Amino acid sequence: MGNAITNNDFVAGRMVMTLKGDTVYDSQDYIEGVSGMRFKIRGNSSASFCGKPYKIKLSKKADLLCRGGKEYKSKHWALLAYFVGNPSMPNGESNLITLFGHALGRNLGISWQPAATFVNVVINDEYRGIYLLVETVNRGEKRLNVDEYNGFIIENDVCWWNENGMYFHTNHQMPHMGYTYKYMPGDGEDSIVVDKVRNYMNQVEDAIFGKKELSSYIDLYTFTRWIIGHDLLATGDALGSNTFLYCENMNGDSVHNKLKMGPLWDLDYSYNIPFTVWGLKHTYYIPYYPEAEFYYPKLFEIPQFVEAYKETYAQIRPHIVDQMQHFCDSITELYSQTLEESAALHRTIYPNEAQNTIPEQTADLMDKFRRRIAAVDSLIAADMPSTGISATTITRPQSHSRFDLTGRNVSTIPFTQLPAGVYIETSSDGTTRKVMKR
């Protein structure tokens, strides 16, 4: 790449990935629509950090995580900085909170959480440190599989003004927020389609703010699991953090035409609030935007949603601590040696980063997780008395997903064809088990 990388414009280039000296991916030189890749700084506040995050857009779809199936191929990827500043963590940083949060989402039964792996990054022959190579929120067979013509993916975004007109506002949305497009039929340039999505969102919001029967408008399964995830992470960030919503098919049946919550994302400020209070995602209140809300403050005024939240929490509560401990044990086994070696190299350019070992970080995360889940138990008991209202069914048909220890979904690969190792199988009721392939 011959030009400086900025957060305004893409820079074209070539991307090569190697593993133990072998080339596992080569985009070749950039030819628009044919080969190569484009690269730019991504993020809002994180774009000002020393280890800047990057957005990658390939000319040709590929699976940069090398899972072997064409359904994983995409043009859209990201490199997230290894250093995650968080004053609640040892030495003021966490390098594992993103993987931890994504694993929590999978164990809660969220339909898709981005897969990722750690990589060492070199740009124009200059070492730039450890990064997390991760799937981004986009339409895809193994991402958010929305209909090409009648589905959409949007983000409730405080930085809507930076999207070159690719956004809309709804009637109940705060004036400083906007919905930006992650996937919009016609790439957001067809005003008829955008108006259809806006009208759909206004109908959903009217139902929520009017305290109507919810199950005809929103998917209680994803809405409850998304907020439980943030409650268990004690998220200390609200506005400006990523809140994704999607509809698989606005013209579809009663399962696929409801509004759904997307994956857990932007987890930097986890465990950065007192454990005795609800997280900011739960309340959507911050002092300098006292009127700021997403849907959850209104939803928790509706007995039907309160009961749905409690029902979901009761389903996941018996297993979730063991599931997250299994994840931490697996990450320690997988990454301890290789990441410690890379961390030493990382510190040659960022001497104050990567100070904590993998076992130290997983132990700290599990300590926080156990204390937080006990606090949420108490908050539910104090704030959510029984309403006597039926939540309606919020279960999914029984199915299983299988993940390797990096979070890659390997469900489509026959178990007999998988490499030897440890895998996590998650059923749609939230239960998981660890299996060994010898």
Task: Please state what every model-predicted region is.
Residues G2-I5, G43-S45, F49, P90, ...:
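Middle-to-C-terminal accessory/interaction subdomains
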Residues P53-K57, K75-A81, N95, A103, ...:
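Structural recognition of the beta-strand scaffold that forms the well-ordered cores
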Residues M1-L96, F100:
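Conserved NTP-binding catalytic cores of kinases and kinase-like/nucleotidyltransferase enzymes
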Residues K57-D63, E71-N86, G109-P114, E126-I228, ...:
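Internal "kinase-insert"/substrate-recognition segments embedded within catalytic cores
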Residues F10-D22, V119-V121, H400-R402, Y423:
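Short polybasic amphipathic segments
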Residues T6-D9, Y30-E32, S46-C50, K70-K73, ...:
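Extracellular/periplasmic catalytic domains that process cell-envelope and extracellular macromolecules
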Residues P90-N124, R408:
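A conserved helix-loop-beta module that forms one wall/lid of the active-site cleft
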